Amino acid sequence: MHYLEQWNYCPKCGSKQFVVHDFKSKHCEACGFTYYFNAAAAVIAIIENEKGEMLVARRGEEPAKGTLDFIGGFVDPGEGFEEAVVREIEEETGWRGLTPGPWTPPAPLRGEKWREGSSYSQDGDGEERSNLKVLFSLPNTYLYSGLTIHSCDCFFHVLIPSDAKLKANDDVAACWWEKPENIKVEDFGLHSARIGLQRFLELKKKGKV
């Protein structure tokens, strides 16, 4: 099946002369427009607190409604990955203590206390740094309104205090802290979330996160 099989008309001029150009594109023989079906950019936040608990969410909307997931979503036009993951965390949990910036290790690893009410920490020169870090990326498919969207999901490791006031918003039905040993990969509804969780736990075992 061609990626654009459902697209029968040119999105620029409306002509029916919209034919296959290559495996991921179609070309309009009427106006010359060529459309390429490229992967959409998305972000996923694997969030931990200083106790080592992970923040899990229950999906409130299709696809995979009712299954577990991580906080995340698609990158908006004009955003970078870092800005997108901060926005998604704010939209879906209400937490506004993050700003894109250089990575700082968790406070417990530095022998320091977390600053109350903030996910920031300070390094030796007093510079404030954000506790979010890029982990890896994975391909994913996302069925929405009958159209299969191919995405490239960028995974972040994010640190938020356990006493942060979080409230499920947007398309998240609920979110809560959970011990890693109680989290089952098969309870996650989206493919990249399952694979991402497995990879993250493997990195944890190796001491790489």
Segments (PLM) and residue ranges:
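Glycine-biased, low-complexity coil/linker segments
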Residues: 111-116, 123-125
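Short cysteine-rich clusters marking metal-coordination/redox-active sites
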Residues: 10-13, 28-31
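Short functional micro-motifs and their immediate structural scaffolds
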Residues: 18-19, 36
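Active-site segment of metal-dependent pyrophosphate-handling enzymes
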Residues: 86, 94-105, 127-163
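Conserved Nudix-box catalytic region and its N-terminal flanking loop in Nudix hydrolases
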Residues: 49-91, 95
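Nudix hydrolase/Nudix homology domain
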Residues: 1-5, 149, 160, 164-209
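Conserved N-terminal beta-strand and adjoining loop/helix that marks the start
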Residues: 30-54, 74
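Residues immediately within or flanking Cys/His clusters that coordinate Zn2+
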Residues: 7, 25
